[in-house]
Amino acid sequence: MKFCRFGQRGQEKPGIIDADGKIRDLSGVVPELTIEALAAAKGADVASLPLVEGEPRYGVPVKGIGKIVAIGLNYEDHAIESNLPIPTEPMMFMKALSSLNGPNDEVVLPKNSTHGDWEVELGVVIGETCRFVSEDEALSKVAGYVLVNDVSERFNQKQRGTQWSKGKGHDTFCPVGPWLVTPDEVGDPQDLDMHLNVNGTRMQTGNTKTMIFNVAQLISYVSEYITLYPGDLMITGTPPGVGEGKKPQAIYLKAGDVMELGIEKLGTQRQQVSEWRHLGDEVFG
């Protein structure tokens, strides 16, 4: 099943995608699309739900994400293009919750940004508490999978100390969605094609089968150090083709650029890049 949240920022409603690819309004079944509400949402008679007209905005497809755990350098070719050693165990960092963004909302570069970059990634939404979970049971703890763009500011990430979160956690830097897709519909998470274009030019092409550490290994590993709760989001690394790795010269995002990305079975995203402005108290997600 494919679940979503649709509507203006801060006013999203829960939805489900029907057999024709249309949004059906779930708000008469559940008040919000949280992990706790998924069981009731799955039991809905989809054909009887109100059809949502037009093309509403998609928000982050699940409400109540508690934390964003990210895995770096999880594709061998990406580690090589980044001039970094291939990890012998997963490299973990965190993205700020304030970086959450709708899948087609604008990405706002931070003030004085010069090294904005893109990363198409498979996201994993946790459905049950994970604490010292074995690899064998790890996938049973997954509520669903999502498409994520792990937008980055490489100068802040790498040139101003060693805390990657400084370059990964800027506002709008974690577009998620359009859908939360249940594991039964995705099948094997280690065989999903993925791509990303910038201004119509293909930049990244890959498949999750080339991950260094697979999804089950990552959930098990992370759960040894950080308890994962229902609704937590783990993003699993990106294939080669990021801007900083382009030859003979790196390519970085600028205002007006358009990123378009997708993962097989998980849908597509489109974001226009904007220059920095004060975002005030805008609600993200």
From Swiss-Prot:
Record flagged with keyword Magnesium: yes
Pathway: Carbohydrate degradation; L-rhamnose degradation
Record text on cofactor binding: Binds 1 Mg(2+) ion per subunit.
The enzyme's E.C. designation: 3.7.1.26
Keyword Magnesium applies: yes
A Pfam family it matches: FAA_hydrolase
Source organism, top-level taxon: Bacteria
Enzyme class: hydrolase
Requisite cofactors: Mg(2+)
Binding locations of pyruvate: L73, K168, T238
Phenotype upon changing E81A: Strong decrease in hydrolase activity
Gene3D superfamilies from the UniProt entry: Fumarylacetoacetase-like, C-terminal domain
List of residues binding Mg(2+): E119, E121, D150
Effect of H78A: Loss of hydrolase activity
Gene Ontology biological process terms in this record: rhamnose metabolic process
Transmembrane segments: none
Outcome, altering M91A: No change in hydrolase activity
Keyword entries, A-Z: Hydrolase, Magnesium, Metal-binding, Rhamnose metabolism
Subunit structure: Homodimer.
Function: Hydrolase that catalyzes the hydrolysis of 2,4-didehydro-3-deoxy-L-rhamnonate to pyruvate and L-lactate. In vitro can also use acylpyruvates such as acetylpyruvate and trimethylacetopyruvate. Catalyzes the fifth (last) step in an alternative pathway for rhamnose utilization that does not involve phosphorylated intermediates.
Protein family membership: Belongs to the FAH family.
Name used for this protein in its record: 2,4-didehydro-3-deoxy-L-rhamnonate hydrolase
Organism of this sequence: Sphingomonas sp. (strain SKA58)
Name of the coding gene: LRA6
